[in-house]
Amino acid sequence: MKIAIAGASGRMGQMLIDTVLRTPGVTLGAALDRPGSDAVGQDAGVKLGKTTGVIVTDDVRAGLSQADVLIDFTRPDATLNHLNVARELGTAVVIGTTGFTAEQKASFKTYGESIGVVWAPNMSVGVNATFKLIEVAAKILAQGYDVEIIEAHHKHKIDAPSGTALKMGEIVAEAQGTKLADRAVYAREGETGPRELGTIGFATVRGGDIVGDHTVLFAGDGERIEITHRSNTRQSYAEGAVRAAVYVAGKKGLYDMNDVLGL
């Protein structure tokens, strides 16, 4: 099975290429990067000190024609462009990009009518196990506990809160029979007054090279429960994405990591 990697010269792209090269049963079919990138025209393994035989291209159509599945951790506008080309060519897509609007996320179902699409705000097996723990806790602690979600990422991340943090908020809200849009508080400043009952607060930290830390805090009177996941490297994301690519190859429909992991 051949896999194409979008954003091939980036940190995540390089991790994905390395993971594909080390995974039995899959090969690197194409490596895509933005027009003007210094990586275009070079072997996809140059930064890794490896020779892959795959040349980085900015021609999306040419690249996707050489692959069964595209793994995309880029930006929303680029991902949507890739999805359009993939649909025309019948190439499945694994989406790890975050920062989509609600309308853009809703469009994934339409793409799934023609090709296989896996979309998840986080591909890590550990994070998806954490999602399940949060769901259980949210049901048990539905009364008498305030919910706060704290996330930290590196200084280069461009969206906030993170897609993973938002997913955690959605899980809490849905487990308690509500909608995140009705409960979310994304900023506090100045004299905010007492905390409003039932809200789900978000706090965002950006700095250094933090790969990704997420904590859901259930704060009650006299006790608090914290469920935390910390990523030390991007390797778990890459391994989960390749696992998702193997799962979705040859399928149609919209899937998430619960489907991939059989949760």
Swiss-Prot record:
It comes from the Bacteria. It is an enzyme of class 1 (oxidoreductase). The keyword Oxidoreductase applies. GO terms for biological process: diaminopimelate biosynthetic process; lysine biosynthetic process via diaminopimelate. Its main location: cytoplasm. Its EC number is 1.17.1.8. Gene3D superfamilies: Dihydrodipicolinate Reductase, domain 2, NAD(P)-binding Rossmann-like Domain. NADP(+) binds at residue 34. GO terms for cellular component: cytosol. GO terms for molecular function: 4-hydroxy-tetrahydrodipicolinate reductase; NAD binding; NADP binding; oxidoreductase activity, acting on CH or CH2 groups, NAD or NADP as acceptor. Catalyzes the conversion of 4-hydroxy-tetrahydrodipicolinate (HTPA) to tetrahydrodipicolinate. Belongs to the DapB family. This is 4-hydroxy-tetrahydrodipicolinate reductase. It comes from Ralstonia pickettii (strain 12J).
